[in-house]
From Swiss-Prot:
Binding of [4Fe-4S] cluster 2, residues: C175, C179, C182
Signal peptide: none
Pfam family, any one: UPF0004
Protein name per UniProt: Ribosomal protein uS12 methylthiotransferase RimO
Amino acid sequence: MTVETFKPKQTTTLDTPAKRLEAASTNAVTTGNRIGFVSLGCPKNLVDSERILTQLRIDGYEVTNSYDNADLVIVNTCGFIDAAVEESLDAVREALEENGKVIVTGCLGAKENQIREVYPDVLEITGPHSYEAVLKHVHKYVPKPEHNPFTSLIPQTGVKLTPKHYAYLKISEGCDNRCTFCIIPSLRGDLNSRPAGSILDEAKRLVESGVQEILVVSQDTSAYGKDKSGRTDFWDGMPVKQDITSLARQLGKMGAWVRLHYIYPYPWVDDLIPLMAEGLILPYLDIPMQHASPRILKMMKRPGRVDRQLEAIQRWREICPDLVIRSTFIVGFPGETEEDFQILLDFLKEARLDRVGCFKYSEVDGAVANTIAELISEDVKEDRYHRFMELQAEISAERLARFVGRTLDILIDDVDEEGAIGRSFADAPEIDGMVFINGETELEPGMLVRARITHSDEHDLWAEVVDADTQD
């Protein structure tokens, strides 16, 4: 969807449904040491789940998608906003009812007392990215097998919960910003960037395994390397600067689509746009702006010069005309007046953003924003949300219409009896629109095809595959 509201099983900018690992070909051998796994929340959490699952495989455990067959269940939780907390607690409850032996990890795990008050029978609780602690607890309750029949079956890239043709690449943990509506720093700590060489090694393995699209994620992607104090790392025998522009340039040389998510609006974002214009990385910018009223942005502790943001958008589009901009906004923030909201609507009209998500402010336990001003009534929040959505739907339809008649590369995600479903450079998986190619039932997921866009609406595109000699 181009414009969406928050639903359970969804995060601030990316919609990642709860996933139980499907027992695939690597489950062919029965070990008697079976672990069930439920992963909730954002793509960053999904990467954490993949790391835990990979180590479980290395340690010889079988991962099952059945509560009944599991000797223990791990629930990797989200705790960002109240709806996510509710979903996580529901998942813990279900795991306890269906199995009884549960380890909880992830963001909500940082609030152990909140979980224990409701579910005191949970075996163990750990916070986010506590991989070693989770594995230690698993070994305690389900001893590690002496013989590991899975070692030769573990992919070089580790266990992945995404389709084979795309993968999330997490480049850092934590965040140094202190947005008043957010509690991520208290859950995941300050910025901690991975070494550039380690990131590039992982990216290379992903591409060699057949991954066609790398989705770069973190809490604050554009801040990558700020904590490295200018230190250079090495990769493939060559020095690599540890900043987001240098990292993106190296990733762009690997032959896969590179899509950047969670770009905080720092001034040096300007340096990324030429890479998009050159075709090194996708011309797609996920840059959460949150609001447009200077007063509200100040209360949020976000950058507050809307005029500069509009100038930047114009500048970026002049450099890279195909640029697609995704953003997210909060309506009904404490203290938001009708005048503040109108400033936001005026900003949308002028900015003409491509993809936009809207959230009605929700109190988050521990967030400063809950007490800085009078809370907005649910009726007012609902009214502003619908007005926001209605306006942005018109803008999104207008922006998508510019693709009609053009021929684009389409990455196929799924094929059914009616045809193929894919995405263009303008579409991130699960949160943006899709490209429908009716009648093309012979295509396969992971294929990259050229297709001419024939129709559009406010969310999606329709296309037909073209031969090489008829392409634009």
